[in-house]
Amino acid sequence: MTEFIPPGSLFHALSSPFPMKRGGQLHRARIAYETWGHLNASATNAILIMPGLSPNAHAAHHDSNAEPGWWESMLGPGKPIDTDRWFVICVNSLGSCKGSTGPASYNPITQAMYRLDFPALSIEDGANAAIEVVHALGIKQLASLIGNSMGGMTALAILLLHPDIARSHINISGSAQALPFSIAIRSLQREAIRLDPHWNQGHYDDTHYPESGLRIARKLGVITYRSALEWDGRFGRVRLDSDQTNDTPFGLEFQIENYLESHAHRFVHTFDPNCYLYLSRSMDWFDVAEYANGDILAGLARIRIQRALAIGSHTDILFPIQQQQQIAEGLRRGGTHATFLGLDSPQGHDAFLVDIAGFGPPVKEFLDEL
């Protein structure tokens, strides 16, 4: 399996050796990132975006890559994250297969793919790697740090590990720890991959590839990324046309089944299964409460920033809205002027990607006031 690196990616060589939180280290590792806008002379207009598990660093198009990005409607000139004003950096997470060093990368020491020899990955490792990029660009303090989904966890880790790195923070559909439901879902996703005989303890290749396992894992993910409300309105119980079905017992019959199958089919050859395992587990392990003797609100209160916005969707079952409320409350206890906003978007966890009409205005208003 190979990495999937967007054209126009930039790369930062991490300090070597790069120590990992749970032990081990990386040698000659790198982080992929992309930028938009221009850094001002005082280097005070920078925004860092930390993405979720599967996205690359290509959040929006730019001169080196004209393809629309995964947050195209949110980022650009005159958009909520206005690149006419801000210098924006988006980092591909350490452990991914989209340009940053991960299990699908080659170990420069052994000249073989890391696979399961990659050190245990924590959210904190991605946080430390991202800040190396920020410092390499000559930025001492970010105007704002934005994290969505898994990136919301990474952003909190950055703020805990690197005090004074940002003046403000926007946490979008993120959390300060993984809840049992989310851990259970991700556990099933990892099990589906590992039970595929082609996974072969991580030693698969393009000929013998755990496609079935990764496809099931992705389907489970998609179900949790959206909401029952959206499924009802979008698909109902509508069945497929006869030319879309076959005579296979228990085969696809409903449109919702076909949607999941199509979505999973597109995903399986654009993401490495071992990387999926590592990143998924890192989310389960993350817990802000570890920074304050088991008290999650006290852990959040250790963060020192001027302003924050925690925003999410009431239909999110993967990162429930209570978790964004918790982030805002904890930050307030530490003296941050923190605002919480819950939206009625029907798209569940993925709402921040598609409901720009809902998420865009509060993000724009927050940044405009900085």
From Swiss-Prot:
User: One MF term from GO for this chain?
Assistant: homoserine O-acetyltransferase activity
Q: Where is this region: Important for substrate specificity?
A: 52-55
Kindly list the positions annotated as binding substrate. R218, D350
Which residue positions are annotated as catalytic?
S149, D316, H349
Query: Is Acyltransferase included in the keywords of this UniProt record?
Result: yes
Keyword Acyltransferase among UniProt keywords = yes
- Biological process, per Gene Ontology: cysteine biosynthetic process from serine; homoserine metabolic process; methionine biosynthetic process
Q: Where is the AB hydrolase-1 domain?
A: 45-354
Q: What is its EC number?
A: 2.3.1.-
Q: Which reaction does it catalyse?
A: succinyl-CoA + L-serine = O-succinyl-L-serine + CoA
Sorted alphabetically, the Gene Ontology cellular component annotations on this record are: cytoplasm
* Alphabetized Pfam families for the sequence: Abhydrolase_1 (PF00561)
Listed disulfide bonds for this chain? none
* Subcellular location per the Swiss-Prot or TrEMBL entry: Cytoplasm
Q: Mind telling me which InterPro entries this protein's record contains?
A: AB_hydrolase_1 (IPR000073), AB_hydrolase_fold (IPR029058), HAT_MetX-like (IPR008220)
Q: What is its main location?
A: cytoplasm
Keywords of this entry? Acyltransferase, Amino-acid biosynthesis, Cysteine biosynthesis, Cytoplasm, Transferase
Instruction: Site (Important for acyl-CoA specificity): give the residues.
Output: R186
Family membership, please give it. Belongs to the AB hydrolase superfamily. MetX family.
Its function?
Transfers a succinyl group from succinyl-CoA to L-serine, forming succinyl-L-serine.
Q: How does it assemble?
A: Homodimer.
What name does this protein carry? Serine O-succinyltransferase
The organism is Xylella fastidiosa (strain 9a5c)
The gene behind this protein is: metX
